[in-house]
A protein has these predicted regions:
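Non-catalytic DNA-binding core/recognition domains of DNA-processing enzymes
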Residues: 1-24, 50-122
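Flexible interdomain linker/hinge and immediately adjacent N-terminus
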Residues: 22-26, 89, 97, 124-155, ...
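Hydrophobic (often cysteine-bearing) scaffold residues that line and stabilize catalytic clefts
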Residues: 61, 107, 165-166, 215
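Alpha-helix N-cap/helix-start motif at helix boundaries, enriched for small hydrophobics
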Residues: 111, 169-170, 181-186
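Conserved tyrosine-mediated DNA breakage-rejoining catalytic core shared by Y-recombinases
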Residues: 185-225
Length: 229
C-alpha cells in the first residue's frame, strides 16, 4: 500500500474538492507502526470511497487522527490497544495548548469516529472511551470580519496600481460579497446575460451545489474584456 496518496489519482468527484485549497496528497509516512498505518489507510479508503464528504473535511479529521496515532506510536502503543487513559492524555495536551472548545471537540470527535470505524470493522470489540466524557461546551462567538469603509475606499483609489487579475478579484469581493475561496474557483463560463440582467454562477463546496448571483453590468463587461485576453 502506498504511503502517500495523490488526490488526482483517486478519481474523486469534482464536487468534493475545493479547488481554492492547495491540497495535493495525503501522507501516512508519519505513522511508523505498520498495523496502525494499515488501519488508518483502511479508514481513509472508507472515508474517501463511501462517505461522499468534502475532501477538505475528511483530511482535516484525518490529520487529527494521525496526530493521535503518532502519540500512541511514541509510547509504543497500538491503536487497537489504546484506552481512555491515552485519550485523556491527548485531551490534556490540547487543553495545555489552549485549543478552543470548537477545535477541541473536532479533534475528539474525529478520534471517536476512527474508533467507531474500528469497532464496526471488528479491529476492536468496543469503543475504549465515551466521546461525551471529553466534550467541551462551545460558546458561539460572532466574528465581525467586515472591512472599514475607509479601508476599501483607499484600495479602490489605488486599484489601478494592482495587476489586472487582482483588480478583478477585488471587484468580485467588493461588489458581490463572495468568499475568497469562491472567487478563486470561478470559471470563465460563470458569467452570462439573461435578458437585461447579468449573472454569475458560483459553486458552493459545502452545499455541493451552484448558486446564481446578480452582478452589475459594469463588472460583467470588465470580465468579458478580461476573459478575451
Amino acid at each position: 500500500e502506498a504511503n502517500v496518496w495523490y488526490l488526482e489519482r483517486l478519481h474523486l468527484g469534482k464536487h468534493r474538492i475545493d479547488e481554492s485549497k492547495s491540497l495535493i496528497s495525503i501522507s501516512f509516512m508519519e505513522v511508523k507502526e505498520i498495523q496502525n498505518r494499515e488501519i488508518l489507510q483502511a479508514y481513509m479508503k472508507y472515508e474517501l470511497g463511501i462517505t461522499g464528504q468534502a475532501v477538505s473535511t475528511i483530511v482535516r479529521r484525518f490529520v487529527c487522527i494521525r496526530n493521535f496515532i503518532e502519540l500512541l506510536g511514541q509510547e509504543k502503543i497500538l491503536a487497537i490497544h489504546a484506552t481512555v487513559a491515552e485519550v485523556k492524555k491527548y485531551a490534556d495536551g490540547l487543553r495545555e495548548r489552549g485549543i478552543q472548545a470548537k477545535g477541541f471537540n473536532e479533534r475528539i470527535f474525529g478520534i471517536g469516529h476512527f474508533y467507531k470505524f474500528m469497532e464496526v470493522k471488528q479491529y476492536i470489540t468496543r469503543m475504549p472511551f465515551r466521546i461525551e466524557y471529553f466534550q467541551q461546551k462551545e460558546v458561539i462567538v460572532h466574528h465581525d470580519r467586515s472591512v472599514e469603509e475607509t479601508v476599501y475606499m483607499e484600495i479602490l483609489k489605488k486599484l489601478y496600481l494592482f495587476p489586472e487579475r487582482l483588480r478583478c478579484m477585488f471587484l468580485h469581493l467588493w461588489c458581490l460579497g463572495l468568499r475568497a475561496s469562491e472567487v478563486c474557483t470561478l470559471k470563465g463560463n460563470a458569467y452570462y446575460q439573461q435578458g437585461e440582467d447579468y449573472w454569475i454562477q458560483v459553486y458552493q463546496v459545502k452545499m455541493k451545489n451552484y448558486k446564481r448571483i446578480p452582478i452589475p453590468q459594469a463588472l460583467y463587461q470588465i470580465m468579458k474584456v478580461y476573459l478575451k485576453k
